[in-house]
Design a protein with these regions (language model features):
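Bacterial Sec-dependent N-terminal signal peptides
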Residues: 1-24
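Loop/turn elements at helix/coil->beta-strand transitions in domains of secreted/extracellular proteins
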Residues: 22-27, 53-57, 125-131, 175-181, ...
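Structural recognition of the beta-strand scaffold that forms the well-ordered cores
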Residues: 26-30, 37, 58-61, 74-76, ...
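Metal-dependent active-site segment of extracytoplasmic phospho-/sulfohydrolases and closely related
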Residues: 28, 46, 208-249
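Short, structured active-site-proximal loop/turn typified by the sulfatase FGly-forming signature C/S-X-P-X-R
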Residues: 40-84
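His/Asp/Glu-rich, glycine-adjacent segments
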Residues: 79-196
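A long, amphipathic alpha-helix that forms part
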Residues: 159-171, 188-229, 378
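Active-site neighborhoods of enzymes that stabilize oxyanions during catalysis
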Residues: 262-365, 369-377
Length: 406
């Protein structure tokens, strides 16, 4: 009997290590502005390799508004922007009497702007460590906590250094090793904005990111967790071509004195005017071509973008390729190259989804699905109990999982 305590302790240690090693790993990678059709238009052998080995969706439908911050946070939380509250890259909150801006460090790191529970918070609350390299929301205590390891956004941080960070995190000892790592790259979005989606420069950017994808695939092969690693590759939205001749000057159709405009380009809010004038402005703008105009109560249900108090009185959505000017400082020349923020039903706004690893089927192509389903997917793979207050549903994409994970 004297040997029992020692044996029992040994059993607990072995069982604990087995439990940790038995839990899968997930690497979630985002390539900003990677339009789904880029995989067909341009030479992408490494993305193709990932698709052939695992799963590829025809496209992934972003949430509206088709902007970077709302969609990255929807991927993280499984919620539409209307529910998590990050309704745009820049917006005013009347309750806070403050404006959220993606370049405002104090706002980005302030948890009060973020609703919902990000996947890293779900994991951390259940004792599963996570790490983030530049994912939207991870620099704040959104949902009540942060990843065990996270990096403050640095646009100039080299791509290879980002990969080095991921590799180093997965090489940590089991007790401190994250089971979920999130990684963000700002290309090919930057090239798409400047040069447009159908340009030589964007083609080069896509091919450069394909090389980055190849480097990731090659580097993870040497990781101790490789056989348990599931790689999920996404983007937040696509990109549409724009030019200065396809512009909408609101001043040509109505008098907006007394109104505040929030956002230009594909999408714009108007608010703050007198109530009786609001309906006149609405009626006036309904006559404008190349634009859809909605009172807040009339915003289509399919957009899931009408109930949050941060949504303003009037929503204007330009038709694909058209740009809404700033009515106080109209400057058509700035609207050239590419942009996003349009209706999320448009193929040009659709994102990519590819995945490979033991959790996924091999060589499987499936139809388009919404990005809010990523959260429950990752929760399932990591054996987590998901937040129930979400819009996504694992059943919507369970067909991509290997039989032992369904």
């Amino acid at each position: 009997m004297k040997q029992f305590p020692r044996f029992f302790c040994f059993f607990l240690i072995v069982f604990g290590l087995f439990g940790q090693s038995g839990r899968p790993y997930v690497l979630l990678v985002s390539f900003d502005g990677f339009r789904a059709e880029y995989l067909d238009w341009y030479h992408t052998p490494n993305f193709d390799r990932l698709a052939q080995q695992g799963v590829k969706a025809e496209s992934m439908k972003p949430v509206f508004i088709t902007k970077t911050f709302p969609n990255h946070y929807s991927i993280a939380t499984g919620m539409y922007a209307d529910h998590h509250g990050l309704i745009a890259n820049t917006f005013y909150d009347a309750e806070f009497d403050a404006t959220y801006r993606i370049r405002d460090r104090s706002a980005v790191e302030d948890a009060r702007w973020y609703g919902g529970e990000p996947i890293w918070c779900t994991a951390e609350k259940q004792g599963v460590k996570t790490a983030s390299c530049f994912w939207v929301g991870s620099e704040s205590k959104a949902g009540g906590c942060q990843p065990s390891v996270w990096k403050r956004y640095d646009h100039d941080y080299p791509f290879d250094a980002r990969i080095d960070s991921v590799v180093a995190w997965f090489q940590k000892p089991p007790k401190t090793r994250p089971h979920l790592v999130l990684l963000y790259f700002h290309e090919p979005d930057a090239a798409g904005h400047v040069f447009g989606p159908n340009s030589d420069e964007t083609e080069t950017a896509v091919e450069n990111m394909d090389s980055v994808m190849g480097a990731i695939l090659d580097r993870v092969k040497n990781l101790p967790v490789y056989k348990q690693l599931n790689i999920i590759v996404v983007s937040d939205h696509g990109m549409a071509g724009i030019n200065p001749k396809r512009i909408i000057n609101l001043n040509d159709y109505t008098d907006l004195s007394g109104f505040t405009q929030e956002g230009t380009g594909p999408t714009s809010f108007l608010y703050g005017g007198e109530t009786n004038r609001l309906h006149q402005v609405y009626a006036d703008l309904k006559t404008a071509p190349h634009i859809s105009v909605y009172l807040k109560t009339e915003i289509p249900n399919r957009l899931y973008y009408k109930n949050h108090y941060r949504i303003k009185d009037l929503l204007l959505i330009a038709h694909e390729g058209w740009s809404i000017l700033n009515f106080k400082r109209p400057n058509p020349e700035r609207y050239a190259g590419g942009d996003h923020g349009y209706d999320n039903v448009l193929p040009s706004m659709h994102a990519i989804f590819l995945a490979d690893g033991p959790a996924f089927k091999n060589g499987y192509l499936r139809e388009t699905f919404e990005n809010v389903n990523i959260y429950p997917l990752i929760a399932n793979i990591l054996q987590l109990t998901p937040n129930t207050d979400i819009d996504g549903n694992l059943e919507n994409i369970a067909d991509i999982l290997s039989k032992n994970k369904q």
